[in-house]
Amino acid sequence: MTSRIVLTYEDYAALPHDGKRYELHEGELSPRGAPSARHQLIIGNLYFILRVHVVATGRGQLFLSPFDCIMSDITVVQPDLVYVDESRRPLISERALEGAPTLAVEILSPWSRHIDRGVKMRLYARHGVEWYWIVDGDGLTIDAHRLEGDGYRLDARLEGTTPRALPPFPDLPLDPAAIWP
């Protein structure tokens, strides 16, 4: 019988800085592929829109990947975009966010689709991420999921061409034309 080796944050932090990206999912090392140009354009557009709003309102901090979110000693993730509201600001350290963000955003890629909708959705729920956006650049949708109990419920969807606010930013209508390249 083979026993599973469970890696910790200490093991993760000791990985060589060779340009490769990894996450730690419940003690198991998970490699991350390089994002596509479209992925980067979408996340850049979304970051710009949200950043202007967050700075103007003074409500929290926004981070782009790669940025570690240390959920536990055996779970470290790097969402594409992370929002931390004022109540969670004390969790921000020099090295990482040491706990769950208010919002985690993932842009679906062909290689990450099953991970973002499965493994990461469960990890985010287990560790108390209040909001989880799944951005589908092919379907031109953003699904805003709200944590309820031990899982997520679809709370709102941005689709089509009409601007719409998504939680946790009820006062920020997102214009699809400004997001999709």
Model-derived segments and spans:
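Gly/Pro/Ser/Thr-rich low-complexity, intrinsically disordered segments predominantly at protein N-termini
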Residues: M1-P181
